[in-house]
Every structure is written in structure tokens, then in C-alpha cells.
Amino acid sequence: MITISNLKKQFGETIACDIQALEIKDGEILGLVGNNGAGKTTLFRMLLDLLKPDAGTVTLDGINPAESEAWKDKTGAYIDDSFLIEFLTPEEYFAFLGKISGLSQEEVDNRLKHFERFASGEIFGQKKLIRNLSAGNKQKVGIIAALFYKPQLVILDEPFNFLDPSSQNILKHVLTDYNKETGATILISSHNLQHTIDISTRITLLEKGVVIKDLSNVEGSAKTELENYFETEV
């Protein structure tokens, strides 16, 4: 379980995060939505100990990520391409990830087979460094890397960005299947409301760092309330 209490972050005069209380249960797929500047990425960065809060606490299964690294073994995340090692090819990158986690090359290859449809023949065997891939293919490498270790907590910031429509739909299946197979908790942020509604079991709406709505989403039940809030069709 993720527990957030009185979490605050401010940049100058701008309040980026002011969450009084939020609990995310094991096995949920939580979608974070909100307009630009809502604080979604800021929250994720604090969850991953990439950004220090001004006040308050975050705990992952009772562990404060700022005080212990025990949470890292069961967490996979992709925020942006700074998470990648861009002077490697995708093959070299995943071989490196396998090596530091004690996996044989055969085990690495077997894990990557699960993502063949998502990779869609555009990542591997291209003889390209990651830095020379398109934005969409970099995104795929990052998402696959986040899932590669079979983590129990997955955090993805705007995972549908840069992906073509086919890849977006495949990714929805990748994430929901992963959740069903492993029971992992998945957190995503997205400006794509329909995709968020399609895969999330719960949707939290942030505006200016504050939780405005926290909605259960059973078979798309949050759709109408989100439509009314954003005054647009999703």
C-alpha cells in the first residue's frame, strides 16, 4: 500500500503538490488526470525519491523511500528518457539490465518475448542507439524496462505519449494483463482520458497539486463525472 500524508511541494510561489491524505491499495490501477501543472509528475518524482517534499510523508508498504532503498527491488518506473542509457542499443541496454540483476541472456530474451507485439519490430534488430530512436520507440524501451524486472509497483508518467494509435491500444492490454497476472499496483498519469478510463480501476483528479476527485472506476463508471468536470467528450 502507498500512503501519502500532508505531502507538500512548492516551487517559488507555485504550489505543485498539496495532498492531505491519499492511500493506494495493492493491486489497483490508479490513473492520475488533471490539466497541465496539476502536479502529477511532481507526485511521481516524490514517490520515487527523485524530488524531496517540503513537508509530509510518502510510504511504500511502510517504507519511506527517502530513508531506505528496500522499495527499489519491487518498483519499476518510467518518467522520461533520462531514465534510459541512450548510448547503448536496446539490445545492449536490456543485456545490461539483465546482468546487474543476475539474469542470463536466455532469461533476458525470454522476458523480452512478452513484449514482442508492443515492440512491433521497431526496437530490436535495428542497429540503432537508443538516442537515435524515434520518441515513440524510446517510449516503448522505457516502458518495457519498467516492467522488465516484474515489479510489484509500476509508475508510468504519460505512457501513451508519442505512441501511434495501434501501440497505444496494445499498451492498454500490456498493462491490464500485467496487473491481472501479477497483482501489481500500477500508477499512470495521462492526458488521454479515454485510455485512462479504459484501464484504471480508480481515477484521481488533481488540480494545482490538490486532489479534487477520487473516483472508483468500475467498467468506466467515472466517465460521466470526468466529462462534466472537463466539459469535453472522452
Feature locations, PLM:
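The feature captures the beta-strand-to-loop junction immediately N-terminal to the Walker
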Residues: 33-35
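Helix-to-loop junction immediately C-terminal to a conserved catalytic motif
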Residues: 48
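Conserved ABC transporter NBD signature motif
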Residues: 56-71, 213
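Conserved ABC ATPase signature
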Residues: 129-133
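Catalytic Walker B motif of ABC-type/P-loop ATPase nucleotide-binding domains
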Residues: 154-158
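H-loop/switch region of ABC-family ATPase nucleotide-binding domains
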Residues: 189-191
